[in-house]
């Protein structure tokens, strides 16, 4: 083999030939982006069941890698604010339900009560908000690619699969935690009853569906450090792929 080349092993334990000058970069514990450009920003969608511990995973990624994290729930909240994309449609949908405060803000507790008893209205709300959230995500993705500031863009969304974000993400990651562990976390951290947890679990996708659609699975059943080490390995593997892609482009 050429002395300028080196065989390294990726996350799937397959050997990939890369330039030797990148080998030190690939085995650091964190991203070193000094040798790489941002014009091929990687877009990762992250999902998993309620109580899977996604918040800790996202916090670790944001703290240790050059990435931006977007939360679909926060985006949904934002697009429903007065003057934003969905607001006028929501005014029409909830015109008779007294869900708007005097200053125009939405009384979200009151809205939740209305939606709980009106399935048709809940579906109508989803048909308004979900497309607006997806369009916001697409716009931000395009801005990030143009700005070339972040190596990785991450979106966390409970409905990542249902809303077909695989169409715009480069890959999806599934944060896996057993139902038993998720139930314990939801009781301890959020005070949820078994009945509420059962209803939540019944409304979510099966583990097999998550695994079928998502490229990667992170086991978050044990210590946080165990999950973090899996993330480090995945991010190193993505860096190997990026270097290999860059080599191919330059040849």
Predicted feature residues:
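Walker A/P-loop
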Residues: 55
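Short beta-strand-centered segment that lines the nucleotide-binding/catalytic pocket of NTP-utilizing
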Residues: 67-80
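C-terminal structural segments of small proteins and small subunits
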Residues: 2-22
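Hydrophobic anchor at the beta1->P-loop junction of P-loop NTPases
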Residues: 46
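NTP-dependent small-molecule kinase module
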Residues: 25-41, 139-152, 166-175, 179-192, ...
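ATP-dependent small-molecule kinase phosphotransfer cores
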Residues: 77-149
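ATP-binding Walker
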Residues: 52
């Amino acid at each position: 083999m050429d002395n300028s080349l080196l065989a390294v092993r990726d996350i799937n334990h397959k050997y990939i030939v890369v330039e030797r000058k990148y080998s030190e970069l690939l085995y650091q514990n964190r991203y070193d982006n000094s040798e790489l450009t941002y014009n091929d920003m990687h877009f990762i969608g992250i999902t998993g069941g309620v109580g899977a511990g996604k918040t800790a995973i996202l916090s670790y990624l944001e703290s240790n890698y050059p990435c931006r994290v977007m939360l679909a729930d926060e985006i949904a909240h934002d697009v429903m604010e007065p003057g934003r994309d969905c607001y006028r449609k929501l005014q029409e949908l909830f015109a008779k339900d007294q869900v708007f405060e005097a200053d125009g803000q939405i009384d979200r507790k009151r809205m939740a009560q209305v939606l709980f008893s009106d399935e048709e209205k809940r579906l109508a709300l989803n048909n308004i908000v979900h497309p607006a959230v997806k369009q916001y995500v697409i716009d931000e993705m395009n801005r990030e690619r143009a700005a070339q500031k972040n190596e990785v863009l991450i979106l966390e969304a409970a409905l990542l699969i249902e809303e077909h974000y695989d169409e715009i993400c480069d890959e999806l990651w599934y944060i896996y935690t057993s139902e038993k562990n998720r139930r314990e976390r939801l009781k301890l951290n959020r005070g949820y009853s078994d009945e509420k947890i059962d209803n939540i679990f019944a409304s979510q996708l099966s583990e097999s569906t998550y695994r079928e659609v998502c490229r990667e699975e992170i086991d978050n059943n044990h210590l946080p450090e165990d999950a973090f080490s899996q993330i480090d390995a995945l991010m190193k593997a993505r860096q190997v792929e990026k270097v290999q892609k860059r080599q191919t482009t330059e040849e």
